[in-house]
Amino acid sequence: MSRINKNVVLALLTLTSSAFLLFQLYYYKHYLSARNGPGSSKSKGNRVGFDSTQWRAVKKFIMLTSSQNVPVFLIDPWILESINKNFEQVKNASQGPASECRFFCVPRDFTAFALQYHLWKNEDGWFRIAENMGFQCLKTESKDPRLDGIDSLSGTEIPLHYVCKLTTHAIHLVVFHERSGNYLWHGHLRLKGHMDRKFVPFRKLQFGRYPGAFDRPELQQVTVDGLDMLIPKDPGRFLEEVPHSRFIECRYKEARAFLQQYIDDNTVDAMVFRKRAKELLQLAAKTLKDLGVPFWLSSGTCLGWYRQCGIIPYSKDVDLGIFIQDYKPDIILAFQEAGLPLKHKFGKVEDSLELSFQGKNDVKLDIFFFYEEADHLWNGGTQARTGKKFKYLFPKFTLCWTEFVDIKVHVPCETVDYIEANYGKTWKIPIKTWDWKSSPPNVQPNGIWPISEWDEVIQLY
């Protein structure tokens, strides 16, 4: 009996001692946390996460670019999104040493930065120094699309992307080039035949799958994870642009062939119309941008851009498309204040809305609103004299950026499908006689407006 009691007592003492030891460890841990802050490590003075491969690669890249006065800025979507969500914390961290690596130490393959090429003064020297610092770098180039319209310069090549690897982490440096519409453009990252396709997992890159266009961002300096760097002043605005940045060029080669086959109209009247149409489009683009209303080139204006990289001189108007969900009631007032009075308003927001504004010297701005169905999109038309309604069907499309008459504007990415819906397979042949009620292959009758609604749906000014 006494032996059993001794065993019980021994077990109880062991259990009590273990519990007390665990309590001491728990207390010690929380005492240190309270004393040194929530981001402290077990060894006083160490910083959590700063030994990661990712952070060391970014630090070395920042040291490299700073020493060479290369004004790079962070564009990595994942990190910018994290910064944007914790912006106050990042601003506060800029005032003192970082105790924990919260952004650049997260495991990933790449970190993306960008620079504006016209600010880069020593590209070749930078490349050599990067390799001396231990980076393995790959550079991609391509012909400068800004010179495609100039035969003698069309072969000039410009840098598009650098991918610099340090051990297992890579820095993707996207080279932005200025375009005449006062925006920034980057090219497609296309590997040439001799390049190592296993250099990094290229498919995981967040930029370079296609060319992209961005508004020129205002930048600010911050300290992130102990590293000083530039980021967009409005990270949220930049992040909104990323998934919608795809850019397609005007087809200069095909346009030259078209203008050789169909001699361009260079009469005084044609040149005056092009000038006025360009001014009208620039004014419309500014007005809609100020309203935050996205639009795209539609109908004859879209055809002119795609077929001949210019304005069709016999079209006599400028055509734009807007998704009906982007309609804002103050559109009419905004155009009137911009000096474009309303010429007519057909339809209503719920059905077949169309607005037309009078520009200078009889150049008209037509805005067609597009409605979405299960498998197609459509815009409406109204005959003022009879009240007849028409519907123009289009396959669904997405929007890409392009440059047209020195403006960054949207066009349907699926441009050929869009144009063929409106003009048929023979869109390459100029047609000067056009009946909007019967010529388009995608038009169909859509009923008639009740006379009781005419005052609302047929407004002429």
Curated annotation (Swiss-Prot):
Kindly state which reaction or reactions the protein catalyses: 3-O-[beta-D-GalNAc-(1->3)-beta-D-GlcNAc-(1->4)-(O-6-P-alpha-D-Man)]-Thr-[protein] + CDP-L-ribitol = 3-O-[Rib-ol-P-3-beta-D-GalNAc-(1->3)-beta-D-GlcNAc-(1->4)-(O-6-P-alpha-D-Man)]-Thr-[protein] + CMP + H(+)
> Which GO CC annotations does the UniProt entry carry?
cis-Golgi network; endoplasmic reticulum; Golgi apparatus; Golgi membrane; nucleus
Attached carbohydrates are found at: N92
Q: What's the domain of life for this entry? A: Eukaryota
Q: How does it sit in the membrane?
A: Single-pass type II membrane protein
**According to the UniProt topology, which residue ranges lie Cytoplasmic?**
1-7
Positions in the Lumenal compartment: 29-461
Q: Give the primary localization class.
A: Golgi
User: What the protein does?
Assistant: Catalyzes the transfer of CDP-ribitol to the distal N-acetylgalactosamine of the phosphorylated O-mannosyl trisaccharide (N-acetylgalactosamine-beta-3-N-acetylglucosamine-beta-4-(phosphate-6-)mannose), a carbohydrate structure present in alpha-dystroglycan (DAG1). This constitutes the first step in the formation of the ribitol 5-phosphate tandem repeat which links the phosphorylated O-mannosyl trisaccharide to the ligand binding moiety composed of repeats of 3-xylosyl-alpha-1,3-glucuronic acid-beta-1. Required for normal location of POMGNT1 in Golgi membranes, and for normal POMGNT1 activity.
Name this polypeptide is given? Ribitol-5-phosphate transferase FKTN
